[in-house]
Amino acid sequence: MVQDNGGAIAQKGFNYQNHVISLTAIRNYTKNNFEIFVESDDDFEVLYDDNYHAYIQVKGKKRIGLKSLLQKHEGKCSILEKHLTPGDGHSKYKIVVFHFTESELSKMQENTSEELFEHSLKLSTEQTDYILEQLDESFSTKLTNFSLVKTSFKNDYLEARTYLKGELINQGISVDGRDDLILDELDRLIKQKSEYIIENKDDKKLKRI
């Protein structure tokens, strides 16, 4: 009998997403007016200062590439089109992965002004033109604000936890043997905020970390 592993696979995806949100919080919590909103207009959003707003999509599975990001199913928007829909020309857009098509990665360029993560990649001119052939030209400005983030950890719970513990130390956060407790509490908070259902625009504040 073939086992249905859909639930387990979905849970791994959520674990990876939560680890990415945790990493973002650990690396950036000292920024002025720093806020994270989970499961709102995207997998999560980051705001800081008075004008920074990033929409972040997390893909915790293999075989991710430009083709899959642009693929439409049953007439619905593609992943990339949906990702670029909220916000405006000043917003930042990031898709976070642990695996991406190598031939496409090699064409991308290092983003020298990455704000949230250790590093990220910008699309090449060729890749940008390819995407705009399949998206409305109105997405052109937003696409210039898009970057791809490839994490140093895979979609593996223990590997991600080990990496996050190292990041706590790198950011000068005193753990005193409480690193597991800190990460557990952060994970609990992310899950709690993710479960709130938005019924009107005022409910978005319930998603804030």
Where are the regions that the model predicts?
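Basic, amphipathic N-terminal segments that precede the first structured/catalytic domain
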Residues: 1-3, 11, 15, 26
